[in-house]
Amino acid sequence: HNYGGKEGLNLQQIYEAGEPFEKFIDHPSWINHMLEFVGGKDTFDHQHGPLFIDENFANVRGPGEAIGIHSGNPEGIQRNHYRYQDGKFHCSQVNILIALKKIGPGDGGTVVIPSSHKSNIQHPEYKHNKMKKNRLSSAEKMTGSLEVFLDAGDALLFVDSLCHGSAKRINKGERRIVVYRYGPSWGFFRHPYRPSTRLLNKLTKFQRKIVMPHEKILTPDR
């Protein structure tokens, strides 16, 4: 799907696409960071499992495409908030973005506004550069923004309350990335897609707890 503009094509729940994408669920390069930043160990947040992936996708974006700025702490969205208390992180959504191809100048790299996850004031240029349906918007010209360049195989980790978007791709070819979003076990799926039985049967016990921590639904009188 897409968001109705020029953000490229998303292939949702990409962990269904085979073993390479299954390995990303608990990849050793970042799984311990996710456990640390989502937090919640020995609390209700771990009642169903250590983490939950509510959405994961591959994104393909061509020339002239971009995604406008979005998120940011001033929006106050509980789904993706940032919190640090008593020496521990409690973040509702933490993203890992993996570059499948090199992303350099002109390739439409991810753009972030550093420290915006801690801000209580909206960026003064936010409304001009935010995502807009049926209209191209990008974030590379925002004051204080930082475009992130990646080599193929690099992974970028950030809390979703960080204000972020992308630059417009001006080079030929396609920008190809994969994104996995992690949060506490009580979360639920963003879109109406559920993991297949085939996938769940292939995963390790730890992976299944991350992909589908929810218990079997108990229906009254059945």
Which ranges hold each PLM region?
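Secondary-structure boundary elements
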Residues: E36-P50, D86-H90, L100-D107
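Short, P/G- and charge-enriched loop/turn segments at secondary-structure junctions
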Residues: R79-D86, T143-G144
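Non-heme Fe(II)/2-oxoglutarate
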Residues: Y126, A152-L157, S161-R222
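A short secondary-structure junction signal
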Residues: I67-G72, Q78-Y82, G106-S115, I121-E125, ...
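Double-stranded beta-helix
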Residues: H90-Q93, I103-C163
